[in-house]
Amino acid sequence: MRASPIRIPTVTSDTDWDFCFHLSQQTKIPEHQRTDESSPTSGSEESEEDTKAKEKVIDHMSHPREKLAQSQKKIAQLIKGKKNIEANKELIRCVTLSRIIFGEEHWKCAQALATLAYGYLTLRGLPAQAKKHAESAKNVLLTWKGTTTSDKEEKQILETLVMLYYTLGVVCLLQNHGREAYFNLQKSERNMKELRESYKGGTCGLQVSEKDLTVALGRASLANCRLNLALVYFEKAVDNVIANKGDSTSELVSLYQEIAQIEQLRRNHEQAIQYLHQAHSICVSLYTEVSPQAAEASALLAKAYAMSGEVQHKA
């Protein structure tokens, strides 16, 4: 099974990003250029517009650490309220503030860039922008020469790597680059494993869930025509969902349907029908017999019976 080609949106300029970047540069006023109000100025005086503009920048960027904390808190609230565009703007602001506080070559800046990339992918559905910022985050981490000062920082870097490589992997998958997608997703998986081991059984607040990463690995395996491996990943994802949300959650519907497609490609039509039956049963129990979800599940089930050579099937 091959994924249908999709149009990848491209943007020649990112207005929000450019504005924030230049704003961050404006705040870095060298010591020798700062005006001392107690001493007379030499040369021509600043215009009123220049003074107001400078005051606006200084006011906007006062106490950057506090503003960063406020933005990070606001992002969670906006995402919860499904205000994705506003949340993405706050992510851009976090990158700007991180540049000011830590510098462009610090891992904290890479963390902000990786989070922005993940936001472009999951909140906005813009793979091109997601890839650009993920690559920037990757370059920062590769060239960073500092050292971590605590166990907490090491865990945060691992979290950043999980998110970074997951984003790159999914973007590659959307662009039909199966091998590159699987390569990046494997890196994300290794970092997630290391992170979970560092918590020693405790919970870690990852933005990328184990289920999402496992599904992405399954799809990447499928894109590379590794059907058996894809099946292993999808079955693992099903087990994860059942363990966390039970065996009647709507999240299982798409998973069962994707597993059924894999089984059809493996010529295991009976197995495919069983999975589609499970998906249909969940749709009927959660919605109604005549709901769009149940109708779609029923159509897939009928198609599976036709492919297996059956003329009739029992609902």
From Swiss-Prot:
Record region (Disordered): 28-56
GO-annotated cellular components: centrosome; cytoplasm; midbody; spindle
Disulfide bonds listed in the record: none
UniProt feature coiled coil, ranges: 65-90, 179-200, 250-280
Record carries keyword Cytoplasm: yes
The organism's place on the tree of life at top rank: Eukaryota
InterPro entries: TPR-like_helical_dom_sf (IPR011990), TTC23/TTC23L (IPR042621)
Signal peptide boundaries: none
Alphabetically ordered keywords of this record: Coiled coil, Cytoplasm, Cytoskeleton
Protein name in the entry: Tetratricopeptide repeat protein 23-like
